[in-house]
């Protein structure tokens, strides 16, 4: 039981937080669209819909290749890298001024997030949990999506009416929700370990 609690703290909890941040950065475009048209006259409903969909083109194209790359390197470091990357993309979205830039940033965001859940499901969770334990670990981690939906709307509403270092509306939303991804990428790299034999908090008996 003690080992299970420690795995919840050191494995499931950091993955839970990563999943929340990923989901918020993925869907905040829906809320940002409420004010983006004020500054971007070219953002017609057709352009907005295309940009929202282009995210999934990047996601689908790179989901398998990126996951294969992650399997060949340290999966924990890979998650930290892609998290840092999608945070930067979200920050860069505050600078977009053209339709093409909108499409490019949405594609890059999909590319960066593409391998997150495959790496979690196929590498990190299996490294830490026996087959009979994985369903519980994954279900607990996936409650992050429900939690994200609960906080996402109210948080977006607040940020859209907030000025942050001279930025207002949708730009505030993008940058404030991107900062946690950039910062937590470094925290995750030290907090999470790829497998039990890499973790100092796992005893020799538990590693066996």
Q: Model-predicted segments: where are they?
A:
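Extracellular/periplasmic helix-loop-helix junction of adjacent transmembrane segments
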Residues: 30-61
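Helical-face signature of the major facilitator-like transporter fold
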Residues: 15-19, 23, 56, 90, ...
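Symmetry-related core transmembrane helices of the 12-TM Major Facilitator Superfamily/SLC fold
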Residues: 171-190
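Cytoplasmic helix-loop-helix junction between adjacent transmembrane helices
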Residues: 105-143
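Conserved MFS/SLC helix-loop-helix module at the cytosolic interface between two early adjacent transmembrane helices
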Residues: 61-100
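Glycine-rich segments within core transmembrane alpha-helices of 12-TM secondary carriers
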Residues: 135-160, 180-181
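Membrane-interface helix termini in secondary transporters
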Residues: 35, 67-68, 158
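Cytosolic juxtamembrane N-terminal segment immediately preceding the first transmembrane helix
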Residues: 1-29
């Amino acid at each position: 039981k003690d080992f299970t609690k420690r795995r919840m703290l050191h494995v499931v909890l950091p993955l839970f937080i990563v999943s929340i941040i990923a989901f918020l950065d993925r869907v905040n475009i829906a809320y940002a669209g409420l004010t983006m048209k004020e500054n971007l006259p070219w953002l017609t409903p057709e352009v907005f819909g295309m940009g929202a969909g282009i995210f999934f083109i990047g996601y689908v194209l790179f989901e398998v290749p990126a996951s294969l790359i992650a399997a060949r390197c340290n999966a924990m470091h890979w998650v930290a890298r892609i998290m840092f990357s999608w945070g930067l993309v979200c920050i860069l979205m505050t600078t977009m001024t053209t339709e093409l830039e909108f499409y490019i940033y949405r594609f890059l965001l999909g590319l960066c997030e593409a391998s997150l859940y495959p790496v979690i499901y196929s590498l990190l969770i299996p490294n830490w949990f026996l087959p009979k334990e994985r369903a519980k670990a994954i279900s607990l981690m996936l409650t992050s999506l429900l939690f994200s939906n609960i906080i996402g709307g109210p948080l977006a509403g607040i940020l859209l009416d907030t000025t942050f270092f001279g930025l207002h509306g949708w730009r505030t939303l993008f940058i404030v929700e991107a900062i946690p991804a950039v910062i937590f990428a470094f925290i995750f790299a030290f907090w999470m370990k790829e497998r039990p034999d890499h973790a100092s908090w796992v005893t020799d008996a538990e590693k066996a």
